[in-house]
Amino acid sequence: VDLPVPLALAAGAVDAAQNVYVACGSSEPGEQKASARVFVAGFHGSPPRWKELPELPGGPRILPVAAADGGDFLVFGGAALEPKDGKVVRRYLRDAWRYRPGKGWERLADLPRPCVAAPSPAPVAAGSVWLVGGDDGSLAGFQPPAAHPGFPGTVLRYHLAEGSWSEVGRAPQPRATLPAVPWDGGFVLPSGEVRPGVRSPAVQIFRPQP
């Protein structure tokens, strides 16, 4: 079933009832204008149809990280697109949001650091959402690009019951713009960028610890 609009650089997740959520991104070529639109479709019945939900209150963004907690949909970070000196630049975000069906959006605790394009849907395990690497914007515009040292490897853990964050070590090969696929009690992290524009053939498995 086609989305109501074209979208790139968005994020999505599947909840416990097999509802597919897609949030934010861009409907235009290049990084020119971001979206705050959110869509959901139930694939547990026939025929599935997309429904538009209230926009993300934090505003338009590209490359956020999404997750599902039971029947709820969560969105973390991403990058807003803003004009500056005749160009469009990224503003790296730390806000976090939860959508509860029938109740709407609520704001969660801000991330300890900005997080853009971390593995998504984010791993959910051990009562937590895990953000593994991604881009925090600290090296945006680094020159020369070939000497870019890579993305931060900090692993962020959002404790669902407490509503709080902690930093829990570093990923051995931090990357951005890649999926996280549940498998064998862990989450497979295939490919992704090790620095802007440079992709990796590496495949790792991330196993969250209690």
Protein language model features and the residues they cover:
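Kelch-like beta-propeller repeat domains
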Residues: 1-210
